Amino acid sequence: VSSPAFPHEFSELGGLRFMGQRFILDGYVHQLACYPNVPTRFMVSGLDIMYALGSERAGELLEDEFKEYDKLKEKLDYAREYIRNMSIDEWRSTLYNGWLYTLIPLLQPIGEGYPSYMQTKAWLDKSLNTALSSWAQLRHDTILYAKQPYAGLTAVPPEAKHVGYVEPYPEVYLRLRNLALATINGLSSMDLLSDGWRERLEDLADLLDKLAVISIKELENRELTEEEEAVIKYFGGRIERILAYE
């Protein structure tokens, strides 16, 4: 709904557009070039538009994305063919289309008969940037009035967690555990073990016992429990507490 600044302007300026966001050609191209039409691609590029308008150089610059995103080139080639077959009347149907139409000559390689510097790739890149900047200004000027493309709402699968690894020497861990328990018993029998060190040695024995169990599971290719994964994750902090000076 438009809002005239002064009451006397209402008859001239007042109006209602039932579908205020208008179709734009480049928005259609970008909608084709993102998820769900192109799996996992959530960020489009201005080069998509330039390629669809006929720029071979834009296609070269998109080569890595063509390899990364399945169906991207297929969708942009479809848009490119659609645009190539547009009639002059369609190009002239709106000022927006007409602006895009003016950019197409900038995207074509310069042939013989033109100055040699205009036939270089550097000149083609310069012209491609000119077209991109003009398109960006067009999009900026109409951002509130055009239907915007957007990627579908989805969730990216979480990265596979890396739990960590215990060197699988269960016998070593069990012998160390027995040594810790023997130390507790020996010092306790002589009344030489403080409560603090008893707690630390018992914690060490418990940790070594868990490492032995984890080692056996690794050797048997068995899945660890969440508790066992936590033992690996927080191993460093636990050892630090055991060894901390009292």
Predicted region positions:
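Polar/charged low-complexity regulatory segments
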Residues: V1-E246
